A protein has these predicted regions:
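Phosphate-binding site recognition
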Residues: 1-341
C-alpha cells in the first residue's frame, strides 16, 4: 500500500523511485497517475483491544493521525471556519462518534475541495477491527462503527477509486451494504497474481544482482509458500531480509522474519476445540502431506464459527495453506508457525 501511496500522492515527487522500473516505460499512464492525485492512506491493523472502548479509541487515534497528514488544509481559505473546527476536532480526538464514523467522507470532501480533484482512498487491513471484535466479544458494537466508517465508499463523488486489503473477501458483510462496483481480487484470482509478491524470475534476478550464489533452493524451500491464481509467489519481506543477511554473512541461515507479524487468535480458537477429523487433517499437513477440502471465499467474521470446517477456508485465506493441485502447507516458515498454534 505504501508503494501505491508513493505512486499516486500529489504531495510527493517520486519519479526517481520508479524511473528504472517497468511502469516508467508507460509514459502516458505515468503522466496521468504518478503523483497526480490526493491520497488518503490508512491502516487499521492497530485497531484492536480486549474491549470495545479500547479498540474504538485506537480507531480515533488512527483517524487523527490521518488528518494530521493533511494539516495544511487548516491554513487554506478553501475551508470555512466551521469546516476547520470539524477538522480540528477529528485531528485531536475531540469529535463525537458520528463525526468519527463519517471522518473518511469528511476528509475526502475537504481534499477534493482543496485540490479540485477526486481522491484515492487506500485502506490496509480493513477487517482487523472485525477480527479482533469477533475474538473479544464486541462484534456488534464494532460492526456499527465500521459500517458508518465505510459509508465513505457509498455514492461518494469525491472518491476516484479505493484500494482495500483484507484477509477475508469483501463480500456479504453488512459493513458494505449499499456499496457497489467492488472488484475483488482473491488469492485464487489471476488478474493481479504476480504484482503483490515476488515471482520466480524476480527472485532469481534479486539473487543475481546481489551476487548471491547457491541459495536458490533454500530460498524456495523457506519462502516460496504461496500460490496466487496460477503463479507461485514468494513473500517479499522474507526474501529481502534474507538477502540482506546473506550480503552481510554469506553463511547466514534462513530465519522466520514473518513470524509474529499477525494475530492468530481466531485460528487458535478453532484448533483448541478441534474434533478428531480436523486433528487428523492437521497432522497430515504438519507431515508435509495434502488434503482435499472445499474452501469458501465468502466467509464473514460473524459466521466463522458456524462450522469447524471453516477452519480450512480461514487458513487458506490467511496464508497458512496454499494450493498446489491440492491444499498443503508449502512453506517452511508457515509449517513452523502452524505447529506452534
Amino acid at each position: 500500500m505504501s508503494m501505491l501511496e508513493s505512486f499516486f500522492d500529489i504531495q510527493k515527487d517520486n519519479k526517481a523511485l520508479f524511473e528504472e522500473l517497468e511502469i516508467a516505460k508507460r509514459h502516458e499512464l505515468c503522466m496521468e497517475w504518478m503523483n497526480q492525485w490526493p491520497v488518503m492512506s490508512l491502516s487499521l491493523k492497530a485497531v484492536e483491544g480486549n474491549d470495545f472502548s479500547t479498540a474504538y479509541m485506537q480507531l480515533v487515534y488512527e483517524v487523527g493521525e490521518l488528518f494530521k497528514k493533511h494539516e495544511y488544509l487548516m491554513e487554506s481559505p478553501v475551508l470555512n471556519a466551521e469546516e476547520k473546527k470539524k477538522f480540528d476536532d477529528i485531528r485531536y480526538g475531540r469529535a463525537g462518534k458520528i463525526e468519527v464514523m463519517r471522518s473518511l467522507q469528511i476528509l475526502s470532501e475537504f481534499l477534493s475541495k482543496y485540490y479540485n480533484k477526486s481522491v484515492i482512498l487506500l485502506i490496509d487491513e480493513y477487517d482487523v477491527p472485525m477480527a479482533r471484535a469477533t475474538s473479544n466479544g464486541y462484534y456488534k458494537e464494532m460492526l456499527e462503527i465500521m459500517k458508518g466508517f465505510m459509508q465513505a465508499l457509498k455514492d461518494n463523488q469525491c472518491i476516484k477509486l479505493a484500494v482495500i486489503t483484507s484477509c477475508l473477501k469483501i463480500a456479504k458483510e453488512s459493513i458494505f451494504t449499499g456499496t457497489n462496483n467492488f472488484v475483488s481480487n482473491t488469492i485464487t484470482s489471476s488478474r493481479l497474481n504476480e504484482y503483490y509478491g515476488f515471482v520466480q524470475n524476480e527472485v532469481d534476478r534479486i539473487l543475481e544482482d546481489a551476487e548471491i550464489k547457491g541459495k536458490g533452493d533454500i530460498m524456495k524451500k523457506w519462502y516460496d509458500g504461496y500460490h496466487f491464481g496460477d503463479v507461485d509467489v514468494y513473500c517479499p519481506c522474507d526474501v529481502m531480509c534474507y538477502v540482506d543477511n546473506l550480503q552481510k554473512n554469506p553463511n547466514a541461515k534462513p530465519d522466520e522474519y514473518w513470524k509474529d507479524t499477525s494475530d492468530n487468535a481466531i485460528i487458535r480458537s478453532f484448533i483448541d476445540y478441534a474434533g478428531a477429523s480436523i486433528t487428523k487433517k492437521l497432522e497430515t499437513l504438519m507431515n508435509g502431506g495434502y488434503i482435499i477440502q472445499r474452501v469458501d471465499e465468502n466467509l464473514t467474521y460473524d459466521y466463522l464459527h458456524s462450522s469447524e470446517e471453516n477452519l480450512w477456508s480461514l487458513m487458506y485465506l490467511t496464508g497458512y495453506l496454499t494450493q498446489v493441485r491440492d491444499y498443503k502447507i508449502d512453506d517452511q516458515i508457515i509449517r513452523d508457525e502452524a505447529q506452534e498454534q
